[in-house]
Amino acid sequence: MTTHYIAGNWQAGQGETLQSLNPVTQAVVWQGQGAVASQVDAAVQAARQAFPAWAQLSLEARIDVLEKFAAQLKVHAEAMAQCIGEETGKPLWESATEVTSMINKVAISVQSYRERTGEKSGPLADATAVLRHKPHGVVAVFGPYNFPGHLPNGHIVPALLAGNCVVFKPSELTPKVAELTVNCWIAAGLPAGVLNLVQGARETGVALAANPGIDGLFFTGSSRTGNLLHQQFAGRPDKILALEMGGNNPLVVDEVKDLDAAVYTIIQSAFISAGQRCTCARRLLVPQGSWGDALIARLVDVCKTITVGAFDEQPAPFMGSVISLQAARALIAAQAELAAKGGVKLLEMTQPQADAALLTPGIIDVTAVDERPDEEFFGPLLQVIRYVDFDAAIDEANNTQYGLAAGLLSDSRARYQYFWLRSRAGIVNWNKQLTGAASSAPFGGVGASGNHRASAYYAADYCAYPVASLETASLALPATLTPGVTL
C-alpha cells in the first residue's frame, strides 16, 4: 500500500497498521501502515533538499502553483466532500463548505502575504531602507480531524507561498482526506519534495516534532498535545512554533427581544459540526429569572427536533456523528460526571445506537456545580450557567484557562462594548454565532488556546521572518567623516 508521499514518490509505511473508519457504519475507509522515524527523517531531508529551488522561485511562480492547486480542488470538489463526510461523519452540505474554504484559502493567503509580508522600501539618507521576508525552511504541519482539509490547508498554503517546504502529518483519524489533498498538489505540478506526507499516530508525530531538520512546527489540535509540543520546544528559540488550540468558550445571553433568534444562534454556536469546532460554545450564560427560564425552555424544545444522521443521509441532517465511538463514549461519560457533581440534565445527550458515533444534543445546567471542570468537551454537550447580573456573567465567562472565543447576544451596543473590553479571548462576537469567523481576520486565542501566533489571515506572519536592509548601489565615503577618523 502506498501510504506516504516522500521526495515525489508514494511508498508503503513500515510502522503500525492504521485504519480510518466511517464513524456511523464502522466500515473501513482507509488502511495503511504508519511512518517510522527513518521515513519521517527521509521526508524532512527531501524537504530540505527541495527548499533552495522552491524558495528561489519568484513569488508569482509559487502563486501559479497554488492557483493550479485551487483549480484541482474545484475539479475534485465532489469527491473531496464525499471523503470528508465519510471519514469524519460530517453531513455532505457541511463537507462541501469545507472544500469551498480550502479553495478560497489560496486567494486569501496571497492577499495576506502581499499586505503583511510583502516587500516595502523607502529612502533613508543616502541609502534605501528595504523590508523583505524570508521563509524559515522546512516546517512540519500537524492537522486535526474536525476540519481535515481546511485547517491543515490554512498552514500549508501560506507556508508554501512564503517559500517554505512542508512535512505534513495529518490526524490518524482522517488519512484519506490528506491523501486526496496531496494528490491535488501533485496534479497542480508542485515539485517533488516541496510537500511531503507522513501518515501515522503518536509515534510518527513525536518523531517529526523531534526531528532536528525542521525549522518550525504549525499545530492545530488539543491543548494537551499543544502543551506537550510547547514543552518539547522549550529552549529552542531558533524554531518557530505556532499553536492553534481549543477553548472552553462562553456565550453570554442578555434579555434580547427576539427569543427565537437567540435560540437559533445558540444552536449554531453549540451544535454545528456535532459540537466539534474549537470555537463552539461550551458554556451558555443565561440570566436568572422568568426571561431566562423562557429562553432555556424554548432552546430545549427546539433542540429536541434537531436532526442527527449519517453524512449522506437524505434529507440532510443538521448534525452528523462525532469522530469515533471512543469520542462518543467519552462525551457520554463527561455528561454523567457533570450530573454526578450536581448538574441537572435539561436535555440528555444520548447515543441512539451503541455501534454508531451519533449523539443527540445535550444541555445540562451546572449552576449548582461547585467545581466545574475547565475542560473542552469536544462534542454536542452544552453547559448552562445562570447569572445574577452582567458583571457576574463576565466574571464567569472569563473563569477559564482558555481564551479562544467569547460571544454576547444583546440588544445593547453599550453592553457589548463593556463586554468586549473585559472579555479575554481572541475572537469576540456580538449577536453572531461563536463558530462564525471572517476569512479576512486573524484566528487565534490567548491563555491555553494558543501561543500568540494567530492563524488564518495572520498565518503569513509565522510563515516568514522579516529581514531589514540598508542598501545603496555604490560604495562611497560620506561627505563628512566621523570625528577621530582620518583618511
Swiss-Prot record:
Disulfide bonding pattern of the chain? none
* Signal peptide span: none
Q: In which pathway does it act?
A: Amino-acid degradation; L-arginine degradation via AST pathway; L-glutamate and succinate from L-arginine: step 4/5
Reply yes or no: does the keyword Chaperone apply. no
- According to its UniProt record, which reaction does this protein catalyse? N-succinyl-L-glutamate 5-semialdehyde + NAD(+) + H2O = N-succinyl-L-glutamate + NADH + 2 H(+)
**GO terms, biological process:** arginine catabolic process to glutamate; arginine catabolic process to succinate
Q: Which GO terms describe its molecular function?
A: succinylglutamate-semialdehyde dehydrogenase activity
Q: Matching SUPFAM superfamilies, A to Z?
A: ALDH-like
Which residue stretches, if any, does this entry annotate as coiled coil? none
List, alphabetically, the InterPro entries matched.
Ald_DH/histidinol_DH (IPR016161), Ald_DH_C (IPR016163), Ald_DH_CS_CYS (IPR016160), Ald_DH_CS_GLU (IPR029510), Ald_DH_N (IPR016162), Aldehyde_DH_dom (IPR015590), SuccinylGlu_semiald_DH_AstD (IPR017649)
Could you list the residue ranges that cross the membrane? Answer: none
> Taxonomically, which superkingdom?
Bacteria
Database matches in PANTHER family: ALDEHYDE DEHYDROGENASE-RELATED
Q: What does this protein do?
A: Catalyzes the NAD-dependent reduction of succinylglutamate semialdehyde into succinylglutamate.
The record, for HAMAP family, names:
Aldedh_AstD (MF_01174)
The name under which this protein is listed is N-succinylglutamate 5-semialdehyde dehydrogenase
